[in-house]
Amino acid sequence: MSNNPRITSKEFQGYAGAAQNAIVALSQAVANSSLEPELQQLVKLRASQINGCAFCTQLHLNESRHMGIAAPKLDLLAVWREAGVFSEREKAALAWTELLTRLSEHHVSDEDYAAVSEYFTPNELAWLSAAVAVINTWNRIAAPFQYAPPILRHAIQAVHEPAQV
């Protein structure tokens, strides 16, 4: 990724405003759903990691930290299966997120559906699927246009200052 986006989010809004507004509306609908906000953030962050979207990964790390999501969950999200810090419901959501994000690599089996259905009602599963769909949509805009990650100023300073031991 370069330091200069190919087009900025503001330019995207100018070029494809109706599309961006529709994605924002879908994002808001998911945010207002019955899914727990923390679970929604984990889903957004995991899909963004898989898709290699620096902007969305950093954005959702910032939001997750602001919400107070435990640091071990954020630190170990990429290895959630082995981490031992996620609930069974979170693990089911993360597995579903990975399946839907990598849909071109495999189909979703009856076993996959049964596994996630143990932890989510049909209504919740519909919203979980919508959450995965919308973050994948954002990733497919922000990653190829190389939106600059929203790195917080204090984080930048910490990188450039030696750690005090």
What are these language model-derived features?
Residues 1-165:
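Hydrophobic alpha-helical segments
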